[in-house]
A protein has these predicted regions:
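Active-site-adjacent structural elements that line small-molecule/cofactor binding pockets in enzymes
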Residues: 1-192
Length: 192
């Protein structure tokens, strides 16, 4: 059995000393993987219910800074040797798939093939509204993004023609070190 650790990279827990200690301790304890959390923005006084808490609110301070999910993992790649490094989860419909493909491939390269791309569709409607992305399209955008990412990783130049994203003759560099970089999908709901 393998164990992964979802750690809170928010506020003071996202600072270098804490990240380094957490990464090294997890690796020494035999933990197989660590994952970061993320939100691009958390609108103040949001009304959406957090589906994983009895209170309907995210744990912790709503105003605590939540850093980019990939950059702390790149830092951990430099201070660890074997632990796998994953986003858990990156809210995929809030990003262009070419950018995500490049971030994950770069992390995989920097870590020597230890990256995991964990993605989700998102639950915080107000976050989507703040980013001007239709909340109702999040599942379809996620599915299409995963196909686009795999396409970008798989060939020298990629063409992708989807409903939301079009990519023409776009080489992606670097390619992932892993032959098939894992994509974990975290989602819940009627359409998922």
């Amino acid at each position: 059995m393998k164990f992964g650790l979802m750690f809170v990279n928010v506020g003071p827990f996202g600072l270098p000393d804490h990240l380094e200690n957490l990464g090294r301790c997890a690796e020494e304890a035999g933990i197989e993987s660590v994952f970061t959390v993320e939100h691009v923005v958390v609108p103040k006084d949001y009304k959406s219910e957090y589906p994983y808490s009895p209170t309907g609110k995210m744990p912790g301070d709503e105003l605590a800074p939540i850093p980019d999910p990939v950059l702390p993992l790149a830092f951990l790649a430099a201070v660890t040797q074997k632990i796998r490094l994953g986003t858990g989860v990156m809210i995929l419909p809030q990003r262009h798939p070419a950018y995500v493909a490049k971030q994950a491939a770069t992390l995989d390269s920097l870590s020597g093939g230890r990256a995991i791309l964990g993605v989700g569709i998102g639950w915080l409607k107000e976050e989507f509204e703040a980013l001007e992305i239709p909340f109702s399209e999040r599942a379809a955008r996620t599915e299409e993004s995963v196909r686009a990412i795999r396409s970008l990783w798989g060939s020298e130049t990629s063409r992708f023609d989807g409903k939301f994203y079009q990519i023409s003759d776009a080489p992606l560099c670097p390619k992932p070190v892993q032959e098939r970089l894992p994509i974990f999908i975290g989602a819940a709901g009627e359409k998922v």
